[in-house]
Amino acid sequence: MTVTYTARVANARFGGFSQLLLLWRGSIYKLLWRELLCFLGFYMALSAAYRFVLTEGQKRYFEKLVIYCDQYASLIPVSFVLGFYVTLVVNRWWSQYLCMPLPDALMCVVAGTVHGRDDRGRLYRRTLMRYAGLSAVLILRSVSTAVFKRFPTIDHVVEAGFMTREERKKFENLNSSYNKYWVPCVWFSNLAAQARREGRIRDNSALKLLLEELNVFRGKCGMLFHYDWISVPLVYTQVVTIALYSYFLACLIGRQFLDPAQGYKDHDLDLCVPIFTLLQFFFYAGWLKVAEQLINPFGEDDDDFETNFLIDRNFQVSMLAVDEMYDDLAVLEKDLYWDAAEARAPYTAATVFQLRQPSFQGSTFDITLAKEDMQFQRLDGLDGPMGEAPGDFLQRLLPAGAGMVAGGPLGRRLSFLLRKNSCVSEASTGASCSCAVVPEGAAPECSCGDPLLDPGLPEPEAPPPAGPEPLTLIPGPVEPFSIVTMPGPRGPAPPWLPSPIGEEEENLA
């Protein structure tokens, strides 16, 4: 019962969707023509009464009523409630389709895990898939009117071959008042366990895989049952329906054409048929009809699911896969492209133009950069962001005014760190201390002991303010230093890196 028009819209062309307007089966005209005729009939009856039946005084009162209804009908949020409602219904409709129990994955697992070409092996495989099909039939006849008309009783299910008479007795003897669509799945599990004990299923991993696929199949059957049980809340459906009907009830009065001689605003024309009001009714009422048709896709409407077709298809292909196709393989041969370095299937004359189109390499494949933008930049000696001196980061971490007094302990230590980590020139950085270059295995001797790491060393004196003459540092007595190994000689500082010596010490002083 599904209306398929996919081939008609395979290619976008002039008037592509316009051709679909001429279809009748599954169309909005087929759903809405009765309501549209009723609305037009009521409208014309009121218009005729206004023109030919009412007295002059009654006409003036009716005209005031028309203006009032036309003014306040727009307060009803028809578009708002219809938009949310139809979106909810369409999402629910697609989710129900995704829950249709298809046996394709299950039949492949059965064919690959239940072994035996004898009649016993065939019996196991066919019975397992028959149980899966029986579970689908039982749930579909519970939710679909089309399937229920096909299998109105369990006797019809037995006569169709989905259930044996012995299985029917066991099915009916189960003391349960709930829907028993799950019973064939339990039979499936018991039969699979028996096949494992007999060695038809060779290991527990295969049995686990088989039962996992069964649980997926059973879960879809259960979701169909719950979708049928739990509907869209009734209050939501009622609100949408009342909003639509009350809006067009107000339009029956408020959209009447009044006598132009009375001089009412926006009533300069006197037409008999309200063209745009009918179009508005067609759109809004058709919108509600879409939700009405999709809210339960297991009925007998033109666009409802083909449940009986699915039952026939699933039963046939499942039996074909586990019986006739079991262990049926073609002779292994080398493929056509066995010795080809690049395998490519041929193209017909209608599709060969696609070979001339370049393959997609990525969205950044065609981006070009200037030559200077592709040069790597040296980042040696940078511990912070670009353009920031090494001491700036330490100074930003200190609170305002803390240790900035010349001669203070914190100020002297910060000044020492600035002198130690700064890069002045290639000569000064190449031989900043005597421990930088020592023979391998010899103990380094350095006169630049770190007062932060060795509390026994005296703290250095505060440097004098930077003057016109360069600052000269006189090292103290040489003492062995074994706590921290000084780094090796550095390369020359980049020209864009400013030296913090002088300016930093002036600020600290």
UniProtKB/Swiss-Prot annotation:
Residues 454-509 are annotated as: Disordered. Residues 457-468, 489-498 have a biased composition (Pro residues). Mainly confined to the retinal pigment epithelium. Expressed in colon. It comes from the Eukaryota. GO terms for biological process: membrane depolarization; sensory perception of smell. One of its GO terms (molecular function) is ligand-gated monoatomic cation channel activity. GO terms for cellular component: basolateral plasma membrane; chloride channel complex; cilium; plasma membrane. It is a multi-pass membrane protein. Ligand-gated anion channel that allows the movement of anions across cell membranes when activated by calcium (Ca2+). Transports a large specter of anions, namely mediates the movement of chloride, L-glutamate and iodide. Calcium-binding triggers the dilation of the aperture, but calcium-dependent gating is only effective when the size of the passing anion is bigger than the closed aperture. Mediates the calcium-activated hydrogencarbonate movement and participates in colonic hydrogencarbonate secretion concomitant with mucin secretion. Belongs to the anion channel-forming bestrophin (TC 1.A.46) family. Calcium-sensitive chloride channel subfamily. Pentamer. Interacts with GLUL; this interaction tethers a fraction of GLUL to the membrane, causing a decrease of cytosolic glutamine synthase (GS) activity and inhibits the chloride channel activity of BEST2 by affecting the gating at the aperture in the absence of intracellular glutamate. The C-terminal auto-inhibitory segment (AS) modulates the open/closed conformation of the channel and determines paralog specificity among bestrophins. In a closed conformation, the C-terminal auto-inhibitory segment constricts the channel concentrically by wrapping around the channel periphery in an inter-protomer manner. This is Bestrophin-2a. It comes from Homo sapiens.
